[in-house]
Regions:
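Generic beta-strand structural signal
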Residues: 50, 87-89
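Cell-envelope and extracellular/periplasmic
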Residues: 69, 89-101
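N-terminal catalytic cores of peptidoglycan-degrading enzymes
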Residues: 1-82
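Conserved small/polar residues in nucleotide/adenosyl-binding loops
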Residues: 103-105
Length: 105
């Protein structure tokens, strides 16, 4: 397994404690080109990030170190947890998504 680093500027600067991490949240990029997804995840203008990106070739890209809060879950909650960015590791899977709009599902 090959790992590279391409750090995103989009994360909370205050470190969290390892025991604060309770969840792993998987997302897919939903973009046709992997390079566009990487550009978005590393652009300060986008204000989104993840801890890890799994590329199409299986390579893992580290974007935010685990002890920092990446901006991947937005306004979120699960059971008694609110703002899941604080308590989770965000993993993006490079994937263009689907051709259907959500209206048709």
């Amino acid at each position: 397994m090959h790992t590279t680093y391409n750090y995103s500027p989009n994360f909370e600067l205050k470190k969290r404690k390892p025991d604060q991490i309770k969840f792993i949240i998987f997302h897919y990029t939903g973009m046709k080109k992997e390079s566009e997804a990487i550009e978005r995840l590393t652009s300060i203008k986008s204000r989104v990030s993840c801890h890890y990106l799994i590329k199409n070739n299986g390579e893992i890209v580290v974007m935010v170190p685990d002890l920092y809060e990446a901006w991947h879950a937005g306004v979120s909650s699960w059971k008694n947890f609110k703002s899941l960015n604080k308590n989770s590791i965000g993993i993006e899977i490079s994937n263009p998504g689907h051709e259907l709009s959500l209206i048709h599902i």
